[in-house]
């Protein structure tokens, strides 16, 4: 079992300010700062719902040991474009050691829903120091660029931006703003199932 966290956040958005303004039928520039913030909020909400990154970024998977459930594979519950690094704290001297891809470990990132990391043929995982967070795997996650993000995910983000723009408060006249279930179901195809 590990802890997944953002190491390096995304620096670009999946939809442009122009695309969002077209969705809103907004032509002026007075609301540009707000709309840009809403794009960020909607993107982060999509990531939370789908349990996956939208734009390129790095996530860190931290474990106390090479937790493999007995089959030597480490299954990380998020899709990845690549495994950027695997490192551990050496048991004997407490030094952080970076493992080498193909020599020490291999990665399988073909799945849309998880990444696998396992020792290279003929090797086994080293024994890390018995301390919290002794093993760290850094993943390159998210679609490669905005053009690679599925259009349905972009459509959800644009619709969410429009809903947030129109309803700038969580409550109106004492009544909650209801979410459109159909719109939220658009993300189902890309949602990582959690157990």
Model-derived features: positions:
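Divalent metal-cofactor coordination and adjacent catalytic microenvironments
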Residues: 1-195
């Amino acid at each position: 079992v590990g802890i997944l966290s953002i190491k390096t956040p995304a620096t670009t958005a999946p939809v442009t300010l122009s695309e969002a303004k077209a969705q809103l039928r907004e032509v002026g520039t007075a609301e540009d700062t707000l709309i840009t913030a809403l794009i960020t909020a909607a993107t982060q909400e999509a990531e939370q719902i789908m349990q996956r990154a939208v734009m390129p970024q790095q996530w860190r998977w931290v474990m106390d040991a090479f937790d493999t459930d007995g089959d030597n594979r480490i299954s990380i519950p998020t899709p990845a474009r690549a495994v950027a690094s695997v490192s551990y704290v050496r048991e004997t001297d407490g030094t952080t050691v970076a493992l080498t891809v193909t020599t020490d470990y291999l990665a399988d990132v073909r799945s849309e829903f998880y990444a696998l990391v396992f020792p290279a043929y003929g090797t086994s995982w080293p024994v890390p120091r018995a301390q919290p967070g002794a093993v760290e795997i850094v993943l390159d996650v998210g679609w490669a660029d905005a053009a690679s993000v599925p259009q349905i995910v972009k459509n959800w983000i644009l619709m969410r931006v429009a809903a947030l723009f129109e309803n700038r408060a969580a409550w109106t006249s004492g009544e909650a703003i209801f979410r459109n279930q159909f719109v939220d179901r658009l993300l189902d195809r890309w949602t990582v199932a959690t157990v």
